[in-house]
Amino acid sequence: MLDKIKQMMSKGTSSNTFSYSQLSSFKNCPQQYKIIYLDGVRKSSESIEAFMGKRVHEVLEWLYSEENRVKPYITFDGLCQTFDNLWVEHWHKEIHIADTRKNSDFYYSIGKRCLSNYYSRYGPTFDQRVEDTEVDLKFTIGEHNFRGIIDRLDQPEPGKWIVHDYKTSKRPKTERQAMNDIQLALYQIAVEQNFGQVDEISLTWHFLRIGSEVTVLHTRDELEKLRKKLIKSADKINNCLGNEINFLPKESILCHWCYLWEECTAKVGPNPVKRAD
């Protein structure tokens, strides 16, 4: 597989479309990147944190659906009912809990807290000028193809855009960390390439567990530095192709949330974390 990809690249065609998830996976563990994105291994196993986060994202996507945007208000009970329905609908037997002190009820309550914090801030009218949710964009950075999915994109006035990203993790970013974050910088570049009039783009992180937000606006120089950082990350991955030694495992605490132990050369047997009840 690696040799085939390397041969395609040597002919001047890139077989790879990068995403933030891919760049993050390679940085955290090159072997995880290889197993998922080169070998094509996909599993139904997921962490309870990831499951909860997906359901919260789906509720907020539903909240800003075209049907709901024309309503004068949305009740919190409506949000909770949607969350409950999605939780039950998508629950499966391969959800795992790394922290054995916690159970599924604990993470369910965190999901409800995330929605409560968001509702308290923006409800019940939710009258933001939403362009779309789950915006799937393709774009290029340097010689690399990229794809990004934006949680929500607003256009409060012509030429002015706001990229929104929902986070259900427990650690919020500082403004300085947000300024150096490549994920939303990636999305800013995507918006600039895919929409006509773009005069200003602000990037907003919603840290739903604690109900806080961070918003940044990049200067052209700041964005250019992040663009070069993205190119460097993509170049590094491409330069590794064709040599197995470049995709060694990187063991860390993140291994507890990885379900590729049976494929990983650093592990023996499946991940021993418990299944959620």
Name each model-derived stretch.
Residues 48, 52, 107, 180-183, ...:
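Hydrophobic (often cysteine-bearing) scaffold residues that line and stabilize catalytic clefts
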Residues 27-34, 54-57, 74-95, 198-208:
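Short, compositionally biased low-complexity segments
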